[in-house]
Amino acid sequence: ISHRINTVHELHNIPKQNGVEIDIRDFNDRLILQHDPFKDGEDFEEYLRHYNHGTMILNIKSERIEFNVLKLLKKYGIKKYFFLDSSFPMIVSLINKGESKIALRFSEFETIHNILKLNAKIDWVWIDCFTKLPINKENYKQLKDHNIKLCLVSPELQNQEHRIEEYKKYLLNKE
């Protein structure tokens, strides 16, 4: 998954089999691709017209636009996606409307217990590593036993690029 691919130009440089993470917010009554607030960005619907890649990770930056995003995903036939970094009230709202393509965060601060409470209602877990990698053999098995798909945040996004090889070796020994 390529991080923060918020323009059609960047999208065209991504191999078709790869997925992308995008930042979506509302701006002047439009859905746009933009990480930062108060700035304009490319039109989300126009971006979808060009999308024929792998999994799309939807990082919603303006809460309560999720249902409009879902309408556009359906319109353009995008089926491989999930919501990332949503607030818990929004997660519950999405679940109550039947949406399961949601990732709950698992980190040293957000425990596996909440994930397991909602495991039949969500498809993904997003593993973040603010200060350390939280996954171990036991919780990995718990997640996999519940058929939850896993997405690992790359350590450099939390200023831990120096630990990438360490984490890679650790994870390879977990399976």
Label each residue range with its predicted role.
Residues 1-175:
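Phosphate-group recognition and catalysis centered on beta-loop-alpha active-site segments
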